[in-house]
């Protein structure tokens, strides 16, 4: 690992339809083997399904889902005196949204519907209403951080 300087953050262009960088990152996370057009088709079709089935603004539902699933705390493993401790740390905004999108995509892919479009639409709608597997994952992460609050003085970086 280089000690000279941190890697530059790549500039991600906003998506064409909603002009959102967050949605563009989400599409990039959906993408497999460089097939971005297919990933965009999946996401936009899921948005259409949300709009038709639940009669809500799909972009607003997406933003609510991402905000609801985004964790505020997580645990990091720190080695102190030969023992590993799970230390609760704050999650910065960029990592929080990255975790949220990953959890939503994983929860959607494990759903029972046949097509990814249906799976993603239902998971996004449920997450926007504070339900679903992705919300459970966030709550479990927060419970883990709360349970290990006693080790917060071992924090590897300053708590914000």
UniProtKB/Swiss-Prot annotation:
Gene Ontology annotations of biological process type: translation
Pfam families on file: Ribosomal_S7
A Gene Ontology cellular-component term: small ribosomal subunit
Iron is among the record's keywords: no
Keyword annotations of the record: Ribonucleoprotein, Ribosomal protein, RNA-binding, rRNA-binding, tRNA-binding
A GO molecular-function descriptor: rRNA binding
Function description: One of the primary rRNA binding proteins, it binds directly to 16S rRNA where it nucleates assembly of the head domain of the 30S subunit. Is located at the subunit interface close to the decoding center, probably blocks exit of the E-site tRNA.
SUBUNIT field: Part of the 30S ribosomal subunit. Contacts proteins S9 and S11.
NCBIfam families noted in UniProt: rpsG_bact
Membership in a protein family: Belongs to the universal ribosomal protein uS7 family.
Official protein name in the record: Small ribosomal subunit protein uS7
Naturally occurring in which organism (per UniProt): Rickettsia rickettsii (strain Sheila Smith)
Origin organism lineage: Bacteria, Pseudomonadati, Pseudomonadota, Alphaproteobacteria, Rickettsiales
Gene responsible for this protein: rpsG
């Amino acid at each position: 690992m280089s000690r000279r300087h941190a890697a530059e953050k790549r500039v991600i262009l906003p998506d064409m339809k909603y002009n959102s960088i967050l949605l563009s990152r989400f599409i990039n996370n959906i993408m497999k083997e460089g097939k971005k057009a297919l990933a965009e088709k999946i996401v936009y079709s899921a948005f259409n399904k949300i709009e038709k089935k639940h009669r809500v603004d799909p972009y607003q539902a997406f933003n609510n889902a991402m905000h609801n699933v985004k964790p505020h705390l997580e645990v990091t493993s720190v080695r102190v005196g030969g023992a590993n401790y799970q230390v609760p740390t704050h999650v910065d905004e960029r990592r929080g949204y990255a975790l949220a999108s990953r959890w939503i995509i994983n929860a959607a892919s494990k759903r029972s519907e046949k097509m990814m479009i249906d799976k993603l639409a239902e998971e996004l709608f449920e997450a926007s209403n504070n339900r679903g597997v992705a919300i459970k994952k966030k709550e479990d992460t927060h419970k883990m951080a709360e349970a290990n609050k006693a080790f917060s003085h071992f924090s590897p970086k300053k708590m914000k």
